[in-house]
Amino acid sequence: MSGSYGGGGYGGRGGGGGGYSNGYDRNGGGYSNNYSSHGGSNGYGGGGGGYGGGGGGYGGGGYGGGGGGDRMSALGAGLQKQNWDMSALPKFEKSFYQEHPSVANRSPAEVDKFRADHSIAVFGNNVPKPVETFDEAGFPRYVMDEVKAQGFPAPTAIQSQGWPMALSGRDVVGIAETGSGKTLTYCLPAIVHINAQPLLAPGDGPIVLILAPTRELAVQIQQEISKFGKSSRIRNTCVYGGVPKGPQIRDLSRGVEVCIATPGRLIDMLESGKTNLRRVTYLVLDEADRMLDMGFEPQIRKIIGQIRPDRQTLMWSATWPKEVRNLAADFLTDFIQVNIGSMDLAANHRITQIVEVVSESEKRDRMIKHLEKIMEGRENQNKILIFTGTKRVADDITRFLRQDGWPALSIHGDKQQNERDWVLDQFKTGKSPIMVATDVASRGIDVRNITHVLNYDYPNNSEDYIHRIGRTGRAGAKGTAITFFTTDNSKQARELVGVLQEAKQQIDPRLAEMARYSGGGGGRFGGYRGRGGGGWRGGRGGGGGGGSVGGANALPLNNRRW
């Protein structure tokens, strides 16, 4: 089948190199359904001009329940329950893996050693052996050429084990930290899967559906699938809330092989008849734990109910809590599982963790001292992500830093979508190497090369602490996490000390003393629920940053420090 993609007609995979205008324009560096992809007159004007274009807000303060502006109430009530007659469904191909002779000849002892050396654990029946090189994975030439062009030296651990699992057509669970290379672990087999299926006919929905918790993650996935699906002319679109529906609807009506979506907006499209999931035979749930954290479980269940039961399903998660296990048990069949690293709550050991016990009034001065050290020299490429406990503190700190000459911008749920996109782009490109964020706004953001995380306010629990500091030290790099810890946080001292000890980090004696006298922290998800306020209270300027470019992000830099 893979040779059957001629030009012409609806089914032909012609068109501009994998991807419609809705989503990230890699050449122009913009989101062309929201503003001009080359910074034109109706977008982010070049050279620092302001923004045009509206872009729907988040509704209801923050995420409207999660996932980039998706509304949560009564979603999916209009979807009809499907009764599948399996005998009437067209057959499809999902098993493509042919073991390379080098892999077949490896002894069980050699396989065990490779897995142990790379912290790979596998579970399930007849799990295929891992591959050690790209050539051993057995991808077709059109995929391998794209991979080699990227200059990767070897597959990551999750790719070594995950590719044979995914290509075999089995249902797969993969547990690995963000930044481990999991996106390519499911994207490349997805391309092979698509090229083995009949071409789309008018009215057909996608063949591959990828669900993600946030629009930021969805766009990042789209960038990968566009890059590697280019030679196959595979079309894709990104479907997420917080932006106009028109461009997304146009993409779906023209036909796309891949749909990357947040759950709420996808259900909206399904209920309004703009697409259907009858052709989906390859389903991916990315960051499943985050989707459940954000309250998407009912929507995920409704969406999966619209997809044929004999599909291939791949679920990816950074953690493996009971809720994720239940979802896997309900929707995956005889699945095989790969875990990378420990399943215990643990921090990435490549991250240097510095925890300083401070008073609330000391935080600003300490932050400036760290910034002076981190940002020393104009040539350095450091990027710093600063976490705060509330949106108001995020704006306060951003305002304070900009008035002190630091190129900081803030991102949180009260910002409109186009401002969030712009801030993220400024941070990614290094034009603004300091980004201040709240926990919710940061979910799903995968910015490479963040060198430092600074926890201005300590989060509500150890799991959030580990997720925060995990923004640095990705994909094999080293990172540094600096955390301000006050006596108000003392109930969490014992749990934090445990995380630091596990990662063999130095512990501030005052923190150790707090841990001895503080009592329990309420377990992994419980414990102290935060102060609510916190952070700098200095009375410069008004409230938050508002819904367009304004507030703290609009302040000019005074006497630029960097």
Swiss-Prot record:
Region span, Disordered: 536-562
Alphabetized Gene3D superfamilies for the sequence: P-loop containing nucleotide triphosphate hydrolases
Subcellular compartments: Cytoplasm; Nucleus
Catalysed reactions, semicolon-separated: ATP + H2O = ADP + phosphate + H(+)
Residue ranges of the region described as RNA-binding RGG-box: 526-548
Short motif (Q motif): ranges: 132-160
Keyword ATP-binding belongs to the record: yes
Binding sites annotated in the UniProt record for ATP: A176, E177, T178, G179, S180, G181, K182, T183
Domain Helicase C-terminal: start-end pairs: 370-515
UniProt GO molecular function: ATP binding; ATP hydrolysis activity; mRNA binding; RNA helicase activity
Main subcellular location: cytoplasm
Keyword Nucleotide-binding: yes
Annotated function: ATP-dependent RNA helicase involved nonsense-mediated mRNA decay and ribosome biogenesis through rRNA processing.
Domain remark in the UniProt entry: The Q motif is unique to and characteristic of the DEAD box family of RNA helicases and controls ATP binding and hydrolysis.
Name of the protein this chain belongs to: ATP-dependent RNA helicase dbp2
Name of the gene encoding the protein in the UniProt record: drh-1
